[in-house]
C-alpha cells in the first residue's frame, strides 16, 4: 500500500470531509479505467459542474429568503421555483446518462483478475492510506494501477459519491447513541485546531463541496 500525508487536519472550514471524500473518489478509475467513452464522460462531468453552479446561485437566493423568514431551509418545496426544478431534472438525467457510460468497479475488477484481494483505504486526521494484497509477480501492475489513479484522477460520479459520504456520516454519527455528543466534545477539546472537526466532515460542508473545489484541493 501507500500513504498520502494528508487528512482532515489539512482541510479548512467550508470543505471539511474532502480528504475522506477523496478516499472514495480514487476508486472511480481514470480516463482509461472505469468508463466506456472517455470523451463522453468528460463532457458529462463538465455539464454537471455547470448545472450545479447554477443551482448554487439559486440556493444563495433561497438562503436569503430563509434569513428573512420565508422558509425554514433552502430545500423547502415552497421556495423551489420552476427554474430550480428544471435544473434538478436536467442534473438527474445527466447522472443517469453518466452511469450508462460507466464500467462499474473496473478498477477493482482489474486487480481481482490478477489475483489481488483486500483492496481498501482509510482516512484520519493526518493521512489517507490505500492498501491491497497482490501476488509478488504483479508488483509492476500495482505500480501502474496506483500511478494511473494518482496522476490522472477524474473525480467520476462526484456528486453521487458525495451523497454516499453524507449517508455514511449519518450512519456513523447521527444514527449512533453518542455520535453527536462525541463530535461536540471533540470540537470543544480541540478549540481552534483542525483536529476539532470530524474526519467525515460537517454535514453543511459535505453537501456543498463542488468538483472544482475538489480538483483545487487535490
Residue ranges and their predicted role:
Residues 28-217:
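Acidic/histidine-enriched segments that form metal/cofactor-coordinating
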